[in-house]
């Protein structure tokens, strides 16, 4: 029985093997056809490449729309305008203003102070000057610029004066102002009961119209105002016409500020006197004031230089000097120097007065009154 079962099993197994052979070949061919490039190819053989058709999908090509170009009508050319000439305006020739008027120009840079040399011998002086000022051709009549002549006195016109005649007096004089420090200087004088003399310009460190209140206060408090020319010009380089114009222009500005009065005292910038200057000043009725004590505050306009200016003042007093040259345009002069000079004057038993007072000239003669 067992033998028969074994025989049947072997026979069935062989039959299955025989039946499976054609099925395996057909299955292999089907796999190859479905999966090209893979098994049963040898791993060292190159695999065939079968690109996929239409991959990636092609982009659709839509036809571009055709838009007709707009046809705008061309603008017609505008007619050319023919300019018409307007009649020229009638011009009136300018005339030089009189009285109060602003100066022609306002300086934007602080001018350089040119030192004034004061000799050491008395009473005569040898002035020095260096700046160059071109003479002006503007015609100005000779004689007294405006107003009536001053009252008769003993002080000569057109003569350089550099020494006081009244004993016990000292004249502190200030050139080139008014400026920012002139007002505080008046406060110092008021505190000490002293008077000063101011030789002013219209255009130098500042515009005199900007300091009209200071000028008016100076006049009201009894200080003396003198002319230092309109623009700080070197009068020795001008003719008589140019000299007269410099004096007249300043007088025309000062007069409305000080009740219509005009100074009769003057000081030439740089102490630049000449025969022409003296002759012209005699015709214009001006007293010419120099100095015989020079503090040289313009050379020592720093706190460290103030002791040098004080020493110069003391040496001038010991040499017999009485008219002192200072400048109210320097801050150190006003804030540090002047009080020391006033203290030295009091210490020596002297009085600080105006030039007119130290010459014995009445105050009525200091100005030319208005007509």
Curated annotation (Swiss-Prot):
<feature type="compositionally biased region" description="Low complexity">
    <location>
        <begin position="102"/>
        <end position="112"/>
    </location>
</feature>
<keyword id="KW-0479">Metal-binding</keyword>
<feature type="glycosylation site" description="N-linked (GlcNAc...) asparagine">
    <location>
        <position position="167"/>
    </location>
</feature>
<feature type="active site" description="Proton acceptor">
    <location>
        <position position="175"/>
    </location>
</feature>
<keyword id="KW-0170">Cobalt</keyword>
<dbReference type="GO" id="GO:0000272">
    <property type="term" value="P:polysaccharide catabolic process"/>
</dbReference>
<comment type="similarity">
    <text>Belongs to the polysaccharide deacetylase family.</text>
</comment>
<keyword id="KW-0732">Signal</keyword>
<keyword id="KW-0378">Hydrolase</keyword>
<feature type="domain" description="NodB homology">
    <location>
        <begin position="168"/>
        <end position="353"/>
    </location>
</feature>
<dbReference type="GO" id="GO:0006032">
    <property type="term" value="P:chitin catabolic process"/>
</dbReference>
<feature type="disulfide bond">
    <location>
        <begin position="164"/>
        <end position="358"/>
    </location>
</feature>
<feature type="compositionally biased region" description="Low complexity">
    <location>
        <begin position="79"/>
        <end position="89"/>
    </location>
</feature>
<feature type="active site" description="Proton donor">
    <location>
        <position position="327"/>
    </location>
</feature>
<dbReference type="Pfam" id="PF01522">
    <property type="entry name" value="Polysacc_deac_1"/>
</dbReference>
<dbReference type="InterPro" id="IPR002509">
    <property type="entry name" value="NODB_dom"/>
</dbReference>
<dbReference type="InterPro" id="IPR011330">
    <property type="entry name" value="Glyco_hydro/deAcase_b/a-brl"/>
</dbReference>
<feature type="binding site">
    <location>
        <position position="176"/>
    </location>
    <ligand>
        <name>Co(2+)</name>
    </ligand>
</feature>
<feature type="signal peptide">
    <location>
        <begin position="1"/>
        <end position="20"/>
    </location>
</feature>
<feature type="binding site">
    <location>
        <position position="175"/>
    </location>
    <ligand>
        <name>acetate</name>
    </ligand>
</feature>
<feature type="binding site">
    <location>
        <position position="232"/>
    </location>
    <ligand>
        <name>Co(2+)</name>
    </ligand>
</feature>
<comment type="function">
    <text>Hydrolyzes the N-acetamido groups of N-acetyl-D-glucosamine residues in chitin to form chitosan and acetate.</text>
</comment>
<feature type="glycosylation site" description="N-linked (GlcNAc...) asparagine">
    <location>
        <position position="239"/>
    </location>
</feature>
<keyword id="KW-1015">Disulfide bond</keyword>
<dbReference type="GO" id="GO:0004099">
    <property type="term" value="F:chitin deacetylase activity"/>
</dbReference>
<dbReference type="GO" id="GO:0008061">
    <property type="term" value="F:chitin binding"/>
</dbReference>
<feature type="binding site">
    <location>
        <position position="270"/>
    </location>
    <ligand>
        <name>acetate</name>
    </ligand>
</feature>
<keyword id="KW-0146">Chitin degradation</keyword>
<dbReference type="GO" id="GO:0046872">
    <property type="term" value="F:metal ion binding"/>
</dbReference>
<feature type="binding site">
    <location>
        <position position="228"/>
    </location>
    <ligand>
        <name>Co(2+)</name>
    </ligand>
</feature>
<feature type="region of interest" description="Disordered">
    <location>
        <begin position="73"/>
        <end position="112"/>
    </location>
</feature>
<keyword id="KW-0147">Chitin-binding</keyword>
<keyword id="KW-0325">Glycoprotein</keyword>
<keyword id="KW-0119">Carbohydrate metabolism</keyword>
<feature type="site" description="May prevent de-N-acetylated sugar residues from interacting with the active site">
    <location>
        <position position="296"/>
    </location>
</feature>
<keyword id="KW-0624">Polysaccharide degradation</keyword>
<protein>
    <recommendedName>
        <fullName>Chitin deacetylase</fullName>
        <ecNumber>3.5.1.41</ecNumber>
    </recommendedName>
</protein>
């Amino acid at each position: 029985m067992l033998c028969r079962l074994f025989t049947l099993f072997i026979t069935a197994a062989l039959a299955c093997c025989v039946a499976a052979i054609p099925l395996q070949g057909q299955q292999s061919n089907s796999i190859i056809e479905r999966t090209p490039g893979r098994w049963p190819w040898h791993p060292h053989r190159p695999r065939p490449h079968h690109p996929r058709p239409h991959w990636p999908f092609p982009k659709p090509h839509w036809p571009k729309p055709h838009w007709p170009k707009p046809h705008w009508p061309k603008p017609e050319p505008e007619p050319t305008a023919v300019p018409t000439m307007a009649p020229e305006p009638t011009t009136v020739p300018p005339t030089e203003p009189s009285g109060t008027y602003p100066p022609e120009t306002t300086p934007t840079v602080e001018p350089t102070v040119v030192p004034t040399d004061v000799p050491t011998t008395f009473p005569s002086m040898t002035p020095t000057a260096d700046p160059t000022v071109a003479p002006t051709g503007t015609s100005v009549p000779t004689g007294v610029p405006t107003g009536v002549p001053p009252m008769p006195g003993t002080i000569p016109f057109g003569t350089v004066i550099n020494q006081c005649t009244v004993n016990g007096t000292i004249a502190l004089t200030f050139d080139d102002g008014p400026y920012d420090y002139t007002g505080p200087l008046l406060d110092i004088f008021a505190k000490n009961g002293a008077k000063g003399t101011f030789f002013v310009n219209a255009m130098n460190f500042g515009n005199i119209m900007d300091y009209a209140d200071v000028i008016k206060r100076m006049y009201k408090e009894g200080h003396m105002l003198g002319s230092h020319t309109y623009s700080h010009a070197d009068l020795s380089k001008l003719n008589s016409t140019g000299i007269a114009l410099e004096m007249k222009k300043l007088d025309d500005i000062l007069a409305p500020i000080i009740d219509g009065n005009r100074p009769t005292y003057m000081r030439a910038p740089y102490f630049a006197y000449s025969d022409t200057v003296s002759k012209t000043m005699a015709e214009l009725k001006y007293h010419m004031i120099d100095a015989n004590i020079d503090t040289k505050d313009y050379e020592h306009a720093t706190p460290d230089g103030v002791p040098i200016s004080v020493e110069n003042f003391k040496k001038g007093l010991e040499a017999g000097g009485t008219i002192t040259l200072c400048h109210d345009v320097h801050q150190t002069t006003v804030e540090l120097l002047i009080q020391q000079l006033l203290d030295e004057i009091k210490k020596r038993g002297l009085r600080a007065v105006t030039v007119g007072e130290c010459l014995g000239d009445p105050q009525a003669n200091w100005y030319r009154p208005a007509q």
